Structure formats: structure tokens, C-alpha cells
């Protein structure tokens, strides 16, 4: 399996937590190499044409239904070398998908359900396998869950689905097991490369979904360290010094922006995934978070802290951010005009403007879809 190291940051905002009633899903798509040229494309709808999607990174081949909706993607230019990686977009039903936030399970759980690295679902094809065939955010979780059961997963992936009413975060952490949580309407959620979902309520299928047999899997292999709870992060995730320097500080800084009165520690391994904000969140604040680098703290690499502090934590915005996007759904507008994909392409979102792209467009501008292989 060819690997593409990815390290992203995600922010999700429910419709009652936003200043204008929008649902917002934002993510920085980061890699370890700046800069991989990307294109913005619109794939047409198709009918009566069963087909397959194939990964360039492993031996995955997935069947696609005979009919598919029009959808957007932001693929790499050099598909054979870099993989497809459509990453983010809307389909014609105004359903948003952003994939993926790389997540990492611990060795205990992977020993009993290893990743299918040879032929499982990779990030590079996960959008093409899913987005053309879903009618809602909830349906997205259900549909992708069926594909994971069928093919297995090649890697740990956090996947975002959103529509005008809901935003869901799905974490696929082992070869076949996953959990998804609906973000409450009056809350926001933050994560960065760690298993994020915490307590799972198996009696609340309206707000949680999960892979078949996951409770039995955990019980059979004695994986739950908590006698009185079922914390997905504690069971399946990691909690080490790497997390404390690379992952948790990004979550900490977001909570500092949206709840400044709360005093968290940037190295706290139990930071909350979902919280209520002390005010209604604007689009500009979501974009500012994705472009942030610990401003007004000793940890700002462009600030005035000590050299040790400035290098202590991995910032949110990077020079190796391939694209930064906010998928916004505005339910107060006519259905055909409700979706906007705000895109910052080709560099650190700290210094790159966000371009609004119409989520229901039936074609992409030639200047964006014909990116050259060398910039």
C-alpha cells in the first residue's frame, strides 16, 4: 500500500450555534509535502451505468450503483502518483462531505480488527465511493458504513457529512468498526488527528450510529478500561506524548477562542470534542480558526514567546495545507442556492483568501479545473 501522510484539523458548527442559522463544516487538508497541485471539478450525474472506483494507492476496487448524483471534488492533478483525493464537496441534493480527518487507533484494538491495507477503502477514493449516492447527512453515515462492512478500511478516517439540518462526524478506526455522532444543533465540535468521539449512548440512535457488533467486539476482547461508561476515544484512541504536542493543542486553542472563560490545558488528553459556545459563531470565525497559529499565546511560532514555546506545539495552519475549506449550508435561502463551498487553495490559510464556490454548480471554471502539474 502506497501511503500519503495526512494531518488535518476539523471544526463543525450546528445550525443553532451559528450566527445566521447555517450548518458549517470546516477542515484543513494537510499533508507532509507542500505543495501538491489540485483541481476543482464537478462530476456529472450518470444513469444506468454500473461502474467501479479504483484506488491508485492499494488494490481497492469498489462497485458503484447504476445511478449517481452530480457532485464536486478537489482531486490531485497527478492521480497515478498522488492518488485521487477528492476531499470535499456537495452533491446535487445539497449534501456535503469532507474526507478525511486522519485518526489513529491504539494497538490493542487493531490487534483484534486490523486495517485492510491491501484492498480496503482508502481516503483517496472515499468521496467518489460515497458522495454521489447519498440523500442526507445521516444517509451518508449509513451508506459509508455499509461499504466499510463490505470492503474493510485501509486506514483510520474521520468523515464529515452535513445537510441543511444536521452535521455528523463518523470515525472509522479499525478494519471494520466505527462510530458516528450527530453534533447537537446548539454546539460546535473540534478535532485534530485524534479519535474524538467520547461517551456513546447506544440507546440514542437519533444522535449516534455505530458498526454492527461493536459492543460485543469490545466486550469479547476486554478493551473497555471504564467500568461505568463507554468512551469511544478511551477504548479505541491513543493518549500519548505525540498527541499532547501534535493533536490536543489544536483542540485546546479552538476552545480558547470559542469559550475564553474556560481554562483548559493544551496537553490535556481529555479535552471535550463537543461544546456549546459562549456566543453565536460566524463564518469568519470558522475561517480564522482554520488559519490560526496560537496567536496571543506563547506558542505562536510567529510570536514573541521563547524559542522552546514557539516550537512546542503543531499549529493549525501550515505551509503544507493543500486546501482549507468551509462547507456552508444556509437553509434560509432557496434550495438551489443554499450551499457554498469556501475554498482556500494552495498554501497556509493564514495568508490565503477563501474563494466562494457555488455548491450547486453544474460545471467548474476552467481556471480551476485545469490546474497544471507544475505551478
Segments the model singles out, each with a brief description of its role:
Residues 133-139:
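Short, charged, surface-exposed loops that flank catalytic or proteolytic processing sites
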Residues 43-44, 54-84, 287, 291, ...:
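Active-site gating/interface segments in enzymes
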Residues 2-123, 143-264:
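A contiguous strand-loop segment
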Residues 1-16, 293-315:
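Short, Gly/Pro- and small/polar-rich lid/capping loops
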Residues 299-375:
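Substrate-recognition/cap regions that form aromatic- and gly/pro-loop-enriched pockets
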Residues 241-297, 320, 327:
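Long, repeat-rich segments with strong aromatic
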Residues 140-149, 286-290:
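Short, well-structured alpha-helical segments that form the helix of a local strand-helix-strand
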Residues 127-133:
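Short, well-ordered beta-strand elements within core beta-sheets of diverse protein domains
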Amino acid at each position: 500500500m502506497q501511503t500519503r501522510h495526512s494531518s488535518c484539523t476539523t471544526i463543525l458548527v450546528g445550525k443553532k450555534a451559528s450566527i445566521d442559522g447555517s450548518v458549517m463544516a470546516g477542515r484543513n487538508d494537510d499533508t507532509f509535502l507542500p505543495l501538491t497541485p489540485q483541481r476543482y471539478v464537478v462530476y456529472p450525474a450518470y444513469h444506468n451505468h454500473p461502474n467501479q472506483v479504483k484506488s491508485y494507492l492499494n488494490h481497492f476496487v469498489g462497485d458503484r450503483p447504476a445511478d449517481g448524483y452530480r457532485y464536486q471534488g478537489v482531486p490531485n492533478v497527478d492521480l497515478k502518483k498522488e492518488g485521487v483525493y477528492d476531499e470535499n464537496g456537495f452533491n446535487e441534493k445539497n449534501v456535503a462531505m469532507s474526507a478525511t480527518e486522519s485518526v489513529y487507533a491504539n494497538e490493542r484494538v487493531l490487534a483484534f480488527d486490523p486495517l485492510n491495507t491491501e484492498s480496503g477503502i482508502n481516503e483517496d477514493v472515499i468521496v467518489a465511493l460515497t458522495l454521489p449516492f447519498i440523500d442526507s447527512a445521516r444517509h451518508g453515515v449509513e451508506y459509508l458504513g455499509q461499504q466499510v462492512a463490505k470492503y474493510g478500511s485501509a486506514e483510520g478516517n474521520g468523515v464529515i457529512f452535513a445537510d441543511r439540518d444536521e452535521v455528523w462526524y463518523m470515525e472509522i478506526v479499525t478494519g471494520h468498526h466505527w462510530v458516528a455522532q450527530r453534533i447537537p444543533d446548539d454546539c460546535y465540535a473540534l478535532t485534530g488527528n485524534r479519535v474524538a468521539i467520547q461517551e456513546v449512548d447506544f440507546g440514542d440512535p437519533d444522535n449516534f450510529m455505530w458498526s454492527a457488533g461493536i459492543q460485543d467486539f469490545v466486550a469479547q476482547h476486554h478493551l473497555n478500561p471504564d467500568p461505568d461508561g463507554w468512551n469511544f476515544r478511551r477504548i479505541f484512541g491513543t493518549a500519548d506524548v505525540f498527541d499532547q504536542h501534535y493533536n490536543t493543542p489544536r483542540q485546546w486553542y479552538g476552545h480558547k477562542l470559542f469559550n475564553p472563560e474556560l481554562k483548559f490545558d493544551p496537553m490535556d488528553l481529555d479535552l471535550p470534542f463537543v461544546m456549546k459556545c459562549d456566543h453565536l459563531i460566524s463564518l469568519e470565525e470558522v475561517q480564522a480558526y482554520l488559519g490560526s497559529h496560537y496567536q496571543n499565546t506563547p506558542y505562536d511560532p510567529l510570536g514573541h514567546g521563547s524559542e522552546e514555546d514557539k516550537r512546542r506545539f503543531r499549529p493549525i495552519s501550515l505551509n503544507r495545507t493543500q486546501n482549507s475549506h468551509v462547507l456552508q449550508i444556509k437553509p434560509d435561502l432557496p434550495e438551489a442556492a443554499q450551499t457554498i463551498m469556501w475554498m482556500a487553495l494552495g498554501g497556509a490559510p493564514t495568508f490565503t483568501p477563501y474563494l466562494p464556490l457555488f455548491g450547486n454548480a453544474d460545471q467548474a471554471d476552467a481556471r480551476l479545473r485545469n490546474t497544471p502539474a507544475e505551478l
